[in-house]
Amino acid sequence: MIDALKNGEIKAPYMVVTYNQTKGIGSRGNSWEGLGGNVFMSFCISEDELPSDIPPPTISIYFSMLMREVLSELGSKCWLKWPNDFYVDGRKIGGTLTNKVDEIYICGMGINLASAPENAGILDIKASVDELVWGFVSMLDKKILWKPIFSKFRIDFCKSKSFITHIANRAVSLQDAEICDDGAILLNGEKVYSLR
């Protein structure tokens, strides 16, 4: 999608949804292959189509929390691990990755609905791809401000403290991390933003 946007083949807003992903990119540049029966979507949206109070480095948190809201409304107990992973019962069920080209955000999101790689989980409720995609689009259209989104994320962040995250290619415990109002974390006196 990034190349298509740069080449002028598509214009924001634009979304693609698939049940199989063969050339996905995960966090830290890892390749990502999605298993069949799950939902994978990529979309691009102009920065001026979003609430102006969103701190740009935390846009993945914002998009992820919108989807988490959709899942919660459908009855899921999923939560968001800092900075961009969906979890149920201690297992990762999906994630979000966002890039920016000029004033356009490009976001990829995947959620395991039916199958999962080893050591990962699947969504804890039955939900269709249409329910998730259209629910997400509806949430996006509401242009919910950062503050109410962040207040819910702050609660989820407490669960993140029993996990690790990767910072500068190192596995780092989140046990002593503190969340900042802009979605960054304070870790050992250093402010760290998610660049995913």
What are the roles of these predicted feature ranges?
Residues M1-E69, E73:
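N-terminal lobe of the biotin/lipoate ligase/transferase fold
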Residues N7, D48-C78, V88-R196:
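Long, positively charged amphipathic alpha-helical accessory segments at protein N-termini or as interdomain linkers
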